């Protein structure tokens, strides 16, 4: 199931989710962790990743919390229809950036000046497509959940000269890391 939302709806939705747990900083940390990692919740209130259940103790340990906080957060998610629908359908996607070099791919990390600005992905992809470079994966960190949002692009081939300079010259770009 795919849900297409306007940018303003997405920002509002994320804000609403975080706001829903504003009365509990510990549960808010759990929700943020679930969203950052693409983890969901099963019908019976267990944390899952693509249908594979994960022990609440493992999640709690990862965020420096307690299993009971994780369980209470999952229960609270299931009690609210909008949250229930989101977390029952959440899916994680593999990020191959850490193994890209072993696979012979090139990784470009773009740090934006302002991650909320539109057109960052399009501008970078345009530069790459102008050089007929094949993109294997694009991974964008959501600025609503990350203190250091970034655009990670994985290419099949090595970079020809001049490409990095063109990406660095884009007005949205603060830094490029290879």
Annotate each PLM feature:
Residues 1-12:
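Short, intrinsically disordered or compositionally biased N-terminal tails of bacterial proteins
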Residues 59-60:
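Short alpha-helical "recognition helix" segments of helix-turn-helix
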Residues 56:
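Helix-turn-helix DNA-binding elements, focusing on the entry/boundary residues of the two helices
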Residues 14-46, 76-178:
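A conserved regulatory-domain signal marking ACT and ACT-like small-molecule sensing domains
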Residues 73:
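Residues in the recognition helix of alpha-helical DNA-binding motifs
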């Amino acid at each position: 199931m795919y849900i297409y939302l306007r940018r303003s709806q997405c920002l509002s939705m994320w804000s609403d989710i975080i706001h829903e747990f504003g009365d509990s900083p510990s549960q808010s940390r759990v929700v943020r962790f679930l969203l950052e990692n693409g983890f969901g919740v099963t019908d019976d209130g267990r944390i899952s990743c693509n249908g594979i259940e994960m022990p609440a103790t493992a999640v709690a340990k990862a965020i420096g919390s307690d299993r009971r906080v994780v369980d209470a957060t999952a229960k609270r998610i299931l009690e609210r229809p909008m949250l229930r629908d989101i977390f029952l359908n959440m899916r994680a996607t593999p990020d191959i950036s850490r193994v890209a070099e072993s696979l012979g791919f090139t990784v470009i990390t773009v740090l934006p000046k302002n991650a909320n600005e539109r057109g960052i992905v399009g501008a970078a992809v345009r530069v790459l497509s102008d050089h007929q470079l094949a993109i294997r994966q694009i991974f964008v960190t959501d600025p609503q959940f990350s203190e250091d949002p970034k655009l990670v692009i994985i290419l099949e081939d090595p970079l020809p000269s001049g490409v990095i300079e063109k990406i660095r010259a884009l007005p949205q770009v603060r830094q490029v890391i290879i």
